């Protein structure tokens, strides 16, 4: 196998990879999805299970995908195709490549919602945002949601057009420190509110009584969102990593960074909701509506609701942008590698796909609300298809490629380049060979069963 021979865009070094990969991971999955899942599935017990999975399942998949990208110097399709021409290898590569192309359009729609809320907080409309029906009225307004979506999407495309170092890496290095600073500020403010201590205890202290099998399944599913697993991103970013950069050290830094932000997101939101609702179970289990409906009501009840609202949605916007940039970069890289297009042409085509598919999701709660796929609006369907079906399949394909085709020894050799260490090698080998495929299959089956009403999650 030939490796590392053709010229390819690269990150400037370890910091560039870590911040870009962390930026990909620290997105809406951390700031939006993680807190509402933690609130719904038992607080501290969910957090404990999540951390255990992050150190095993999540870590192993991050290392596997990054190593696969660097050893092949290819985006997902090329990386899988490097080891044979069989149909299942081609399928594994393409499903990894298609996922970000389908995710980033609807992700940009949600990013547009964040822009709308940020603008309204800047205008001082804190009380309006907290009124019942505000969010549903906004997303059903086709013109308003379209404008916000286009602003977010075009900004993302513009950054990708600038390149890996001048676009992706530079923006990540700028935004990630801001994200960390704002996370710390808002976390401190939230946990010091009157009545917030009970929320802190609920989130940080595991209570075995809150344990259920669905807690484990939800935590496993969150791994994909939080760590950008099975989206083609880490394979692509791995292909930009220099050989003198340690994969184990870099991915460990990403893992720690991502988990720390997720924990801070929980401390930002759950104690504040506790203080606002007195720990009301219905409020805690608001689900996806937590950020756009419940949190504005929480902020409206605070003395510093407007400035905190501004800071919070700046934080969410930074997180959303870094992830959308990573998703788009992965898609663009596939077009460059497989169609031999230049970066500019690839970016423009991906941008056009984003706008076409994104408009369906943007209008799905308004003018196109009557159009549903298996009972779901466009945004919900794309989310279900990618996260509940395609990503677990992509993860299984990656595990089989590494354990059955490439061989664990070759991946180990790639990982030790740079610093020459692989401290968690035994965990990696066991997880990739046995548990990761099983976990992914459980997520796939339980998610599909939940979507069709066979079980309730």
Where are these regions (language model features)?
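Extracellular loop-to-transmembrane helix junctions
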Residues: 38-64, 144, 390-391
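Membrane-interface "cap" regions at the ends of multi-pass membrane proteins
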Residues: 1-32, 61-66, 70-83, 87-91, ...
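Membrane-embedded translocation segments of transport machinery
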Residues: 2-7, 11, 169, 173-321, ...
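A generic transmembrane alpha-helix motif of multi-pass inner-membrane proteins
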Residues: 379-402, 424-457
């Amino acid at each position: 196998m030939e490796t590392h021979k053709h010229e390819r865009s690269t990150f400037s070094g370890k910091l560039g990879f870590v911040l870009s990969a962390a930026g990909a991971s620290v997105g809406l999955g951390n700031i939006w999805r993680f807190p509402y899942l933690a609130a719904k599935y038992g607080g501290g017990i969910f957090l404990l299970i999540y951390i255990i999975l992050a150190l095993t399942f999540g870590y192993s998949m991050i290392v596997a995908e990054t190593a696969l990208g660097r050893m092949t110097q290819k985006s997902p399709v090329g990386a899988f195709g490097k080891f044979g021409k069989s149909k299942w290898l081609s399928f594994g590569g393409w499903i990894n490549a298609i996922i970000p192309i389908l995710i980033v359009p609807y992700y940009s729609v949600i990013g547009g919602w964040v822009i709308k809320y940020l603008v309204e907080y800047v205008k001082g409309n804190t009380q309006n945002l907290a009124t019942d029906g505000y969010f549903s009225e906004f997303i059903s307004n086709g013109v308003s949601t379209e404008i916000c979506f286009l602003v977010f999407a075009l900004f993302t495309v513009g950054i990708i057009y600038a390149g890996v170092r001048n676009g992706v890496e530079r923006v990540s290095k700028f935004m990630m420190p801001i994200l960390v600073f704002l996370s710390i500020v808002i976390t401190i403010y939230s946990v010091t509110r009157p009545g917030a201590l009970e929320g802190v205890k609920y989130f940080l202290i595991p209570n075995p009584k809150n344990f259920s099998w669905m807690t484990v399944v939800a935590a496993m599913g969150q791994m994909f969102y939080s760590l950008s697993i099975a989206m083609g991103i880490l394979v692509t970013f791995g292909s930009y990593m220099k050989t003198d950069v340690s994969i184990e050290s870099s991915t460990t830094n990403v893992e720690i960074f991502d988990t720390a932000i997720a924990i801070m997101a929980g401390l930002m939101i759950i104690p504040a909701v506790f203080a606002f609702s007195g720990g009301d179970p219905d409020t805690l289990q608001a689900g996806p509506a937590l950020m756009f409906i419940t949190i504005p009501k929480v902020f409206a009840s605070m003395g510093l609701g407007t400035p905190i609202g501004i800071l919070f949605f700046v934080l969410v916007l930074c997180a959303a942008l870094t992830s959308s940039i990573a998703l788009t970069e992965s898609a663009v890289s596939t077009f460059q590698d497989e169609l031999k297009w230049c970066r500019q042409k690839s970016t423009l085509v991906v941008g056009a796909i984003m706008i076409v598919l994104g408009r369906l999701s943007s209008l799905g709660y308004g003018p196109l609300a009557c159009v549903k796929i298996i009972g779901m609006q466009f945004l919900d369907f794309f989310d279900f298809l990618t996260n509940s079906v395609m990503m677990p399949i992509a993860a299984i394909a990656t595990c089989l490629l590494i354990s059955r085709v490439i061989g664990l020894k070759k991946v180990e050799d790639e990982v030790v380049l740079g610093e020459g260490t692989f401290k968690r090698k035994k965990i990696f080998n066991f997880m990739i060979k046995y548990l990761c495929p099983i976990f992914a299959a459980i997520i796939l089956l339980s998610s599909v069963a939940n979507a069709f009403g066979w079980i309730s999650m």
